[in-house]
């Protein structure tokens, strides 16, 4: 039985740091594990310009513990009024690594998101020419579409037509949750990749609803049927290099999750690697973990892999029920459960 696992230091290709006290409280959890992270721009107000992106990056860097090497990779929040010149300028000058497309009102702080994706095709053409990645929250928001069908409908209505129209555009299909998304990514050209979260590998929709409402298992996109979870597991542990790690770690204070209208988001950062590794061990795929966590993402983004390594050891430990941060009390994914691996 393997007792330790050493891999190149991984990256998180999708997460939320928030801002202010919460940001300062959660950045260290990510920085201790990952060398880089794609940081979501859905603040209030959102990160829509190069100047805002540069300022947010400095705030994040100020929250990184002394002596820790961590690089935030910033994203621009796309709106119906996005200035393509500023966007591309931010990319070419190293402020932005990618741009983020939120359909309006699809998730937390997305009210300023895009209402007409096709109207932004000229912006996407500019991005494709520059080699800039488009990160997409792939859900429709129409009131007549069942919440469990939002991703499937988005593929048919928006993602497939966009890819057909601009096949040179690199698209990161973020936090995929369905076998439909897996099939789309596998069938598309190499400019389509996808991140998979730990929660969507561990839980199906029963985890939100059985035994009472479970608010700390509620995120967007919501977890789906068991058949979809199994398809995601297969993609992560034995699929092509198009799939890579992205936690979608999204901290909210405990009391805002446990309320009459609880916030969407799972705080996966504190035990992210241990959570993913549990899945790879269950699928007898420990030898595939480094590719998913450390190699596939850099290859998709055209960035070098990290030179450093990290080691996880088989040391069972209990995840605390909550964590006290500068931003308040937050409940981590796997709270109250035992994990078999621990980062040294």
Swiss-Prot record:
GO cellular component entries: cytosol
Pfam families: Amidohydro_1 (PF01979)
Cofactor note: Binds 2 Zn(2+) ions per subunit.
Keywords (A to Z) from UniProt: Hydrolase, Metal-binding, Pyrimidine biosynthesis, Zinc
Documented EC number(s): 3.5.2.3
Entry annotated with the keyword Transcription: no
Biological process, per Gene Ontology: 'de novo' pyrimidine nucleobase biosynthetic process; 'de novo' UMP biosynthetic process
Spans through the membrane: none
Enzyme class label: hydrolase
Example of a GO MF term: dihydroorotase activity
Record: residues binding substrate: 16-18, 42, 137, 220, 252, 264
InterPro entries assigned: Amidohydro-rel, DHOdimr, Dihydroorotase_CS, Metal_Hydrolase
Pathway: Pyrimidine metabolism; UMP biosynthesis via de novo pathway; (S)-dihydroorotate from bicarbonate: step 3/3
Binding site for Zn(2+) 2: 100, 137, 175
Residue numbers bearing the N6-carboxylysine modification: 100
Protein residues bound to Zn(2+) 1: 14, 16, 100, 248
Active site: 248
Gene3D superfamilies associated with the record: Metal-dependent hydrolases (3.20.20.140)
Reported cofactor(s): Zn(2+)
Highest taxon of the lineage: Bacteria
Family according to the record: Belongs to the metallo-dependent hydrolases superfamily. DHOase family. Class II DHOase subfamily.
PANTHER family named in the record: DIHYDROOROTASE
Function: Catalyzes the reversible cyclization of carbamoyl aspartate to dihydroorotate.
Subunit: Homodimer.
Name of protein: Dihydroorotase
Species per Swiss-Prot/TrEMBL record: Erythrobacter litoralis (strain HTCC2594)
